[in-house]
């Protein structure tokens, strides 16, 4: 049985919504990247490098590639990598550190407002501002140095 007129209209409408939502998500990620680059640029000895994810597949958005950011610091590196738009909230981005391999996730609560979610499922009670993010970045990269000696 072929596709009817209404089925074709639904498919076209869904494709338009998917494209609009995907483009909005990519704009959101670009804005996050710009914010983090501006914050990091103020730190002596820190630098950023942009990149792109492998293909991400989401039912509502289709297949797409998203921007990534690597933050180079004297004590290590942070990788900022989008995971998905369709997540409770308005998207999820993973932030993980090298050499510690510690990570947190950024959950977009409102446009331009991100909340930090730990692996324990606890949201950090910090505003989305430069100083708390830079402290978090340092803690993630050097967390093993803060552990008591055995």
Describe each PLM feature range:
Residues 18-21, 89-101, 126-135:
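Short secondary-structure transition/capping segments
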Residues 1-3, 7, 44, 50, ...:
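Feature targets compositionally biased, intrinsically disordered low-complexity regions
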Residues 52-101:
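Amphipathic, interaction-prone secondary-structure segments
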Residues 38-42, 85, 142:
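Short, intrinsically disordered, mixed-charge
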Residues 101-150:
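Glycine-rich, aromatic-bearing surface loops/beta-hairpins
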Residues 49-51, 80, 93-94, 104-116:
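Generic preference for hydrophobic/aromatic residues in regular secondary structure cores
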Residues 1-57:
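Charge-rich, low-complexity N-terminal segments
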